[in-house]
Amino acid sequence: MTSDEFAKNFYLEKLAFLKSCFEAQPEQPSAVNVKIKEMALTEHQTEKLKEVIDILLDDVFYTILLGLDGESHIGNTQQVYKIYDQDDNLISDCGELEASAYEYFHESKYEKESH
């Protein structure tokens, strides 16, 4: 796995979280999904909330990836982490992950590739 694939997988996970928050009939509703339904929002309010949660998830996932890359704090610690896949291949050394994460979370790389 490359650092680009790793960042893409984080982005796909973010999309799955966002979808689970707003699914009409989920098999296993998340706590967030239940709370949003309890709010009985209008369609416009639901879209605005979805935008807010989308931005929040972007910020959270992107910041975690930056933290793993040593570009940001995780808690009170800022250091570079080396990430390996299950076959002991180095996924990310220093700096590679930040560049890929930026492309996915701020430049819509996934959406551009999908269309």
What are these regions (language model features)?
Residues 44-99:
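Amphipathic protein-protein interaction modules
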Residues 1-45, 74-76:
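N-terminal low-complexity, intrinsically disordered segments
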Residues 2, 30, 92-103:
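Secondary-structure junction/capping motif
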Residues 1, 102-115:
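Short acidic DE-rich linear segments
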Residues 8-9, 79-82, 100-102, 108:
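Intrinsically disordered, low-complexity segments enriched in small/polar residues
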